[in-house]
Amino acid sequence: MGKVTGFMEFERVDETYEAPAKRLHHYKEFVAALTDEEAKVQGARCMDCGIPFCNNGCPVNNIIPDFNDLVFHSDWKNALDVLQSTNNFPEFTGRICPAPCEAACTLGINRAPVGIKSIEHAIIDKGWESGWVKPQPSKTKTGKKVAIVGGGPAGMAAAQQLARVGHDVTVFEKNDRVGGLLRYGIPDFKMEKWLIDRRVEQMQAEGVKFETGVFVGKEAIGAEVKNYSTKTVSPEQLMKDFDAVVITGGAEQPRDLPVPGRELSGVHFALEFLIPQNKENAGDFKNEIRATDRKSTRLNSSHLGISYAVFCLK
């Protein structure tokens, strides 16, 4: 615990946003990470609880009190090492994770919880800026080949971990670019796509191969699921060519809402709009669903719903 009375001395400080009048004119990120000093002060608010509920609240079990303490002591390199020991892609989660760790923070019972997500964001950004995040290729090879079906965040993380222990890993992705919903479901104003490309380059340097535009399977997928593949490979072929196959497909099949009016023109699932819109922003093609000069509503307050609303405004 860096500062015993830190949680009593310091208030929570959140990341700052660009003014709405400015952010309406571009699709880029508008959140500014904490400065080094701000992150240090926020790290001082951590109480290093005997039972760190934040760890259990985190889906990847980040060792949160440890990196908070290291940031407070300005030991950024070791803070990065602690963070990366449990999280392959902190620059993703530090931007778009809903932060259940903060909901589990004990300090949040009677004060504002520790700003864990913003500290994580600051750590990984400093790690990249300082040149500390580097490829970690395995020094030895196992001779085993592993296929990863699905190039979203789960597939990317599995591929990186398996490559680092010496397996030959190939990722099969049905879209023309890797990233899954990180790339096609999340707008640039939440997370710019060069962050994914940078990680892909690191993984390629670690020996991971990416086969894009490849659909794995025999059966047709639902009409609601976007499929831009140009090639098909059967599961049997993968089983023949690889020693193991890891299935990391995303949850793209939407759940319909059986209500009056659902059948009307202009009622769309979120990803029917978001995926083509992200591809339009990437310069691929024009999104056929247009919200220009139209009144729009959304039956959702989640990240997808908010993304849809902001795209419509822009």
Residue ranges and their predicted role:
Residues 45-48, 56-57, 103-104, 170:
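C-type cytochrome heme c attachment motif
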